[in-house]
Amino acid sequence: MRLQPGSRVPFKRTGIAVAVVVGCLIVAGRITGVVVDWLWFSSIGYAGVFWTTVSAKALLFAAVFAASSSVIAASGFLAHRYARRPGSWQVETARLSGTPEFISELADQLAPRIPWRTSIAGSAIVLGLLIAAGQISNWDLVLRFLHQVPYGERDPVFGQDIGFYLFSLPAYLAFKNWLLQLLSCSAIVAAVVYGVRGDITFERPPCRLSAAAAAHGSALLGVFFVLKAGSYALDRFLLLYDDNGVVVGAGYTDIHVELPVLWVLIGLAGAAAVASWINMRRRDYRVPAASLVLVFGTSFVFALIYPALFQRLYVKPSELQLETPYIQHNIALTRMAYGLNQIAVKPFPAEQELNLTSLEANRATIDNIRLWDVQPLMDTYAQLQEIRTYYKFLSVDIDRYRLEAGYRQVMLSARELEPSMLPANAQTWVNLHLLFTHGNGVVMSPVTEKSTEGLPSFYLQDIPPVAHGGPAIREPRLYFGEGGEGYVIVKGSVAEFDYPKGKDNVYTKYSGSDGIAIGSTARRSLFAWQFDDPNILLTDYVTSTSRILLHRNIQDRVRTIAPFLTLDRDPYLVISNGRLFWMQDAYTTSRWFPYAQPGFGDDANYIRNAVKVVIDAYNGTVYFYVSDPNDPIIRTYQRIFPSLFKSLAAMPADLQQHIRYPEDLFQIQAQLYRAYHMDAAEVFYNREDLWQFPRELIGIDGGGGSSPGTPMTPYYMIMRLPDEPREEFVLILPMVPSQRDNMIAWLAARCDPPNYGKLIVYAFPKDKLVYGPFQIEARIQQNTEISQQISLWNQMGSRVIRGHLLVVPIENSILYVSPLYLRAESGQLPELKRVIAAYGDRVVMEETLGGALAALFKESAPLASPPQGTADARAREALAHYNRAIERLKAGDWSGFGAELDALRPLLEALGGGRSEGQK
């Protein structure tokens, strides 16, 4: 049955009503999202950050929308004004021109029925909205451009301050792209108007245009050539990121061929623009055709083909000679971009002079050699300390504390709540959002100690936390952590689960400062809409004092406040003054540093650890401390968000003792430094001294007998650097030559104030062979006693897990230590069973670190042969003290070990003096 004309009206009205409702829902969703964000930013004290961001987005959207819509509408209205009047285009004329008759009839009937002004205005508005929506993400780019600060160094080609490349050039490129979008949309709207009105006909060939359409097209083509000239001008600066030569950055061909060609193209594009505008009167199709061929033909021949031929035929045969200055630019600016130019290089003799006396003098280092790897320790924590299935240790952090036992490196992990681990029938809305709201407590272990069963010792354990020489914790609850997905509601009528106690549970009420008040019906409705969760509105457990906690995952929390910062992958827990805090390293990065080698992320080539973020695990307060005030990017953001950042000096003194050099940054710098320690262009070109990361054997059975090994990763340790007066917390990584396994250097990053952030490379003598980690691994595998013991364990149903091999610099020598774990084939509880130590040509394996060191240095102990009978008693006494020292060392009794060495020293000196007298 055919619909009557009148029956279409209700259908049309229904369609309009549905469209209006859908539009209102979309707008309402956007508005509620903005309101919720405003409430959250206000609740944490960063309303100023919110308004700066929102106003920047709104102003940019409005400006782009207004400009885009106006220009597109102007183009459309000009076409409407000068195009043929509807009905004036006769079908017969169209037929003679070769246009299909049905198209001619359709256009002739359609044109008079179109409300042209309304259609053009509507199209301009829609296109303007789409363009503005696409450009709104550039709000950060615009603010950085407007508030930029100079870098203080200039590029070697154009002499521009590097701040121009970090802030201005990306903005200019974004502006150019917007103008091209705008021009394209303007041309499309005008073409549609002219096409429907009959000003464009499609003959075979070519396309025939009316005088108005030809003039309009010439004008737009002239604008296109102006934009193309501007694009070529910007392309000059993009040569500094070219990656077609020996290194990243402009090379000999770029400077001597491509740069002059770009100047020629700028001139040609400008001339083509003028010719196009002159052609608005002549309207000769040959002018735009010739302009396009001239500009793009020249670009193809002289910007693509000619440079490639020049590079191959002229530059390649004399590449080193011609490219040397540009290689030097790349080396200098890459080192600057990654902070490699701040690395100090010091010699390391790599001597073989360690003995028990040396170990006692470096007792702080020995006491803090890490025997527990992260994964075995996390597995052990899970078995011993998770207490209930809904608790989870998500990571293990490494830090240092001044405890009763001294300056100790520790490993610690937060016991976080994982509601998803609750039984399926217990995952109710009340449990997930009102009852199970927080984790509880921390476990902390010394890195070197173990029990007789091979399990870790604990400084902190259990719920509530019990300290055994560890720091006291007054507030162990974690409402914010590395988990913390989803919202929770606190201060309601139902008490929150705190921790299990025997057969009963202990409950608590949140008394912190975080949260958005949701006591009113309006607020509850707002959040019910935002989270699509009507329970927030319907529940009786929400009271007038209730608050909702959002963004409880610490990285999500930081990113929401400061999305322009790049976050380190490993936030770590800090215990300070009885409270728990998260420390998050944050970076400023860029991909616009000229001549710098991309080294991470999306081709980023600049990085600074500019910010240390501290998050209170209970209150959720977030503080941003500027750790690199010389970084121009963070200085720019300080101008944009003056209330967001604090100086590092404002960080509480106790928290300052726990800042550490971030491992992600160190890894990036070490990766680049493998090549960029070579500062001579010829050496760099030939890759004569390329380094690489050492290999090691880790995991079950060391990865197998034929394993090629795993690249070593940086590790923290407490040690006394050469020529330094005291021990400190450092991050180190050994280096070996490319395709070789002997060690050539080790890189250290200092973590303790006031030397925080200083990088040092300790280089070994070129004429001395120092065993590298993989060579030590080979010697361990070749040790008959060790290999037989491992085979025996495997035959008994246990799995042997090789731990990381640690290179431990002590004084001017290198000691190697590696833990060995056993795990039942069907179990998940690794036990630290043996410690392997190597020094010089010796490799030993014992049950404890003390035992391994005692066995390793037993034969190299400084024993003296008495020259006379009167010295026999001294020699026997010295030997007795030495044997007791060894026993104390095996037992881990360092105080007894030190006392025996103190008693041994004068006896050895007396024996040495007696020998000297006898030899005279």
Predicted regions, residues:
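Soluble extracytoplasmic regions of secretory-pathway and membrane proteins
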Residues: L3-Q4, A17-V20, C24-S43, A47-A891, ...
